[in-house]
Amino acid sequence: SHAYSQNSYDIIISNGRIIDGSGNPWYEADIAINGEHIVRIGDLSLDTANQFIDAEGLTVSPGFIDPHTHALRGIFDVPNVESSLLQGVTTLTEGNDGTSPFPVDEHFQAILDKQISPNWGIFVGHGTIRSQVIGKEDRDPTPGELEQMKDMVQQAMQHGALGLSTGLFYVPGSFASTEEVIELSKVAAKHGGIYISHMREEAAQLIDSVNETIHIGEESGIPVQMTHHKVIGVKNWGSSVESLRLVDEARARGVDITIDQYPYTASQTSINALIPQWAQEGGRGRMLERIESPEIRATIKREVVLKILYDRGGGDPKNIFI
């Protein structure tokens, strides 16, 4: 038999349960680290290290990826992002729900200059691009405007965007046709991107929205992530049985679609989600003009009340936390 040659490492993490992210079952092993790299996994009980970490009773895994954040609002103020790192999250993605920085290359440079701690990825937001080309108008783009939007998606992808995000529930994404989204998704797909969507509706029209999301993936040939899948409104609870069946059927016929969800029975968004989309058409100035009209304000108020009772408001104003 050969004598064991003792090795020395910077760090050895021992006695932990390893979950490696591959989908395989956990297993017990030691991990050796030199510099910033894992160099060996196995029984390292005879080896030495400058630092030993005993992971007895703990799980050792790669850093978690948070696929849906709005960390952009605070990343430059708190670049270490301890709230994520202390939970094991080492990669954050932004640009979700159709809103993103643009141009993307300028944003990445700002991130590098700030030296933020986690890994960072950006989706290019459909709503951001639409706003820059069309504004908050409720209409289709002209052929020239659509080409301009496609060029902007291509530019973002060439500068490192992960794909295209939409927030079809929010203005101005809500004013976009399915075909518009398909055309832009085709551009992202050419560059290896994915499509991630806050769908058009997650309440009474949930099933229509799931079908639309699947259709976008099929027509544009792009992998699809159906983000924070949920069923809003008590009367709609149970619809997830149908929505999940649709996703399973789409996957069975070859559509690359996945979903994520958050593990609590609440949602959070901006308060303008309670304001009807037609009232937001044309931008903030136009919305304020409508609110100044007593008749229109009364109509808006009625719709806000309905949304609180049957949609985003959780059924009762007591369930809203501002």
Predicted regions span which residues?
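Histidine-rich, glycine-flanked metal-binding segment
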Residues: 4-12, 18-63
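Divalent metal-coordination and catalytic microenvironments
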Residues: 16, 31, 36, 57, ...
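Structural recognition of the beta-strand scaffold that forms the well-ordered cores
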Residues: 66, 91-94, 119-122, 196, ...
